[in-house]
Regions:
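Hydrophobic membrane-targeting and insertion signals
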Residues: 2, 220-223
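Intrinsically disordered, low-complexity segments enriched in small/polar residues
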Residues: 3, 20, 27, 77-79, ...
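An exposure/low-complexity boundary signal
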Residues: 97-99, 218-221
Length: 223
């Protein structure tokens, strides 16, 4: 399956005890992603043959290419504080990175366009619990030819209390994909998005269940 599109980077803070999500927000414009899972590699041999093998996933990283690292979005996610600075007659607020910052746990998901010789799909990828890491910055002075630098942010993948670390589903339409993605946050698709894709959110075919992943019967979503 070939990938030919990427969009809809969404996130919401997660309550660690209840594993329910807050408001869903856009992280940034999507440019690229790369998932790197951490796996066990334990093996037991006896009588000259492999008897036990453990390759279970224990976590991982996800690198996200984004079009904007808006500090009003990323600073709170990184657990950064704020400081007031006096500038003439004005008092301005600046974000403060500190060695004691503790990033917030969030759920994160996006939609990937995929295509083969038979059909095109919109695939939902959802990570129920991640944290974002402080990221490096770089830039150049203006030159004769424009050379745009876009940021890359890295998330650390965690499992929920039941061990779930990722959900995905291949959908036939963008509206179905949005419905699944918002359902995994425990939400419904905003009306303006539903109208943009030509249907109402209260349609029986597109209205997602208002449940969070740990409480949702995922057979309904992943079959």
């Amino acid at each position: 399956m070939a990938t030919n599109g990427l969009s809809t980077y969404l996130y919401a803070t997660i309550d660690e005890k209840t594993e329910k999500y807050g408001d869903v927000n856009k992280l940034a414009g999507a440019i690229s992603y790369k998932e790197s899972l951490t796996k066990n590699s334990a093996k037991v041999y006896s009588d000259n043959v492999l008897k036990i093998s453990d390759s279970s996933v224990t976590g991982g990283k996800i690198d996200l290419g984004v079009d904007d690292d808006d500090p009003d979005i990323f600073s709170p996610l990184l657990g950064q504080g704020k400081k007031n600075v006096k500038v003439g007659d004005e008092t301005l607020t600046v974000n403060v990175g500190n060695s004691n910052d503790v990033p917030k746990y969030v759920g994160f998901g996006f939609i990937e366009n995929e295509k083969n010789d038979k059909a095109a799909y919109h695939t939902v990828n959802f990570y129920p619990k991640i944290t974002f890491e402080p990221y490096d910055k770089e830039g150049n002075t203006k030159q004769e030819n424009n050379d745009y630098k876009t940021p890359t942010v890295t998330g650390t993948i965690y499992g929920l209390n039941n061990g779930d670390y990722k959900y995905n589903r291949r959908c036939k339409s963008m509206l179905e994909a949005l419905s699944v993605l918002y359902a995994l946050f425990g939400k419904t698709v905003p009306t303006e998005l539903a109208e943009q894709y030509g249907k109402e959110t209260d349609s029986p075919e597109t209205n997602p269940p208002e449940t969070n992943p740990p409480e949702t019967d995922l057979e309904e979503i992943t079959e």
